[in-house]
Structures are given as C-alpha cells and as structure tokens.
C-alpha cells in the first residue's frame, strides 16, 4: 500500500469509476512517477471536488472516470444523468481558473447530458445515437485489443518528449466523435477507422457484444491524442488506456507522466499555505 506523498512537488487528483478497470494495475502507473503524488477518488464523490475550492491542493486533474451514465436504466440504456447546476458551475469555474487536466480513454464518454463537457474534452464517445453539435449522430464504435502502430504527429510538443516517432500498441480503439478542428493533434493510430472494423456501442447495451450488424457510421478520425484549451485550462486527452497491457507499456506511462507534468506546469500556482511543510 503506497504511503501519502505529502511533499511531492506535483499533487494530482485522479477521478475514477463509471467503467470497469483494475484499480491496482492502474494505480501502478502513478506510483512510478517521481515527484508526482496521485490521490484517487471515486465518482460521484470526485465530482464534489471539481471546483476551484476542492482542487486547491492539487496541481492537475486526471479524468479516468465515466460519470453521468446510468447502466441500470430500464430503457434507453445507458440513461443520461444530469450533472446538476452546482457541478456545472464548479467545473466551469475550474476551467476559467486554468487548472490543468489530463483525460484518459473512457473519460470521453462522461456527462453525456452536458454538451459543454464534450466541448471541453474535444470529443464525445456516444453509447447510443443522439444529437451532437446540432446533428444527429450514430452511436460510437469500439474494438478491444487492437494491435496497431501509434504515430507521433507533434514531436516538438512537451507531451511527446522521449516518445518514439512510431511505437506499437495493443489496446481498445474508438470510432467516436473527435472535434479535430478545435484541438492540436499529438498522436494518430495507423488503423482503419471504418464501421466494419468496429462494434456498435448501442448493440452492446442491447446485449449484443462485439456486433455491428445493421450499424452504420461515417469513416472516423484516427486521432488518439491531442491537447486543447478548455477555457483557460490546458487539457490533454489520450485515447489509449483500456487495461493492464497498456498500463504496463512504458511508452504509455511516459505519455501520461509527460501530460501531467505539462498541464501542471501550465496551471496557476497553488497558494503557498496549501503545500505541505
């Protein structure tokens, strides 16, 4: 059991829950980061901290959560849960303040009832068809354990420091909504992002896992990593992160660490009295 790193120069809040994951294996990513302390908080409690007051002790927020989806809904699964006015106001204020954010993998599906959340992250994974940016969009696609090559497209960016130009990955990929015009691309996947290569998320909700029969989707973006401004915050999204194969990948660990260090360096400094002495 890791101890509490009160004196770590970078304090990070890591929001989790909403999608299955191996907590111990995921936490090991952060235990290997020198000078970074990660405090893991489950949703829905994590949402109570996502405001300027709640995030005062932290230099960065990592999103590995998937809030706002009710998988026990009796119809139209998953149901969409409204985040509430208090969360919307607090999270918006956090972005206005400029707190750095790193969003990973399934975080792209979070808070589907709040369009501004997708705008902040730079995209949306849709579990069922619905409106997005004024257009009706199909449900998104997923494909587990895809062996592919990831390609760095912004080698000079600090998040790409020490990352090889090309590196192998084996992870889940999404055929989802990426707002490419609003982001700075960092990573692309060499893979065919077409409906035939993915499974329907809505079919999975109907009990038909790994099925795309009758499902159609436009050809999608191969973008799997980007940075953007969300209000005054610097945000990095990394699409990989489905399970232990990726958690243990040293290149992935370097990506996550680089992203945390970069967004923390771009965040407003904490008050001196909030640091451990």
Give the ranges of each region predicted by the language model.
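A glycine-rich, often tryptophan-bearing local segment used as a flexible ligand/cofactor-contacting loop or short
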Residues: 68-162
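Catalytic beta-strand/loop cores that center a nucleophilic Ser/Cys/Thr
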Residues: 3, 24, 28, 33-36, ...
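Extracellular ligand-binding/catalytic regions of CAZymes and related secreted enzymes
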Residues: 2-9, 204-277
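Short, solvent-exposed loop/turn segments at secondary-structure junctions
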Residues: 19-20, 67-68, 108-110, 165, ...
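Helical hinge/lid and interdomain linker segments adjacent to catalytic or ligand-binding clefts
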Residues: 9-15, 23-103, 107-111
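Hydrophobic residues at beta-strand termini and immediately following loops
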Residues: 41, 186-188, 238
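Short, glycine/charged-enriched secondary-structure capping and boundary segments
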Residues: 27-30, 75-78, 116-119, 200-201, ...
């Amino acid at each position: 059991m890791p101890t509490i790193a009160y004196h770590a120069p970078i304090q990070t809040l890591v929001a989790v829950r909403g999608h299955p994951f191996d907590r111990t294996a995921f936490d090991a990513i952060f235990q290997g980061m020198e000078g970074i302390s990660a405090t893991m908080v489950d949703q829905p409690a994590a949402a109570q901290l996502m405001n300027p007051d709640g995030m005062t002790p932290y230099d960065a927020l990592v999103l590995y959560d998937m809030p706002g989806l009710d998988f026990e809904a009796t119809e139209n699964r998953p149901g969409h849960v409204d985040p509430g006015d208090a969360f919307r106001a607090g999270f918006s204020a956090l972005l206005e303040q400029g707190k750095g954010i790193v969003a990973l993998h399934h975080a792209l599906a979070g808070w589907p009832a709040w369009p501004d959340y997708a705008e902040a992250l730079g995209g949306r994974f849709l579990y069922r068809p619905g409106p997005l940016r004024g257009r009706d969009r199909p449900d998104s696609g997923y494909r587990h354990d895809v062996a592919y090559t990831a390609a760095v497209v912004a080698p000079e960016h600090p998040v790409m420091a020490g990352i090889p130009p090309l590196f192998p990955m084996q992870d889940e990929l999404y055929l989802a909504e990426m707002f490419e015009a609003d982001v700075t691309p960092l990573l692309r996947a060499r893979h065919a992002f077409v409906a035939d290569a993915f499974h329907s998320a809505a079919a999975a909700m109907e009990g038909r896992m790994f099925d795309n029969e009758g499902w159609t989707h436009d050809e999608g973006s191969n973008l799997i990593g980007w940075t953007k401004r969300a209000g005054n915050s610097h945000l990095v999204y990394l699409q990989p992160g489905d399970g232990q194969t990726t958690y243990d990948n040293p290149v992935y660990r370097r990506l996550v660490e680089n992203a945390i260090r970069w967004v923390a360096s771009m965040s407003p400094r904490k008050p001196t009295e909030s640091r451990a002495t």
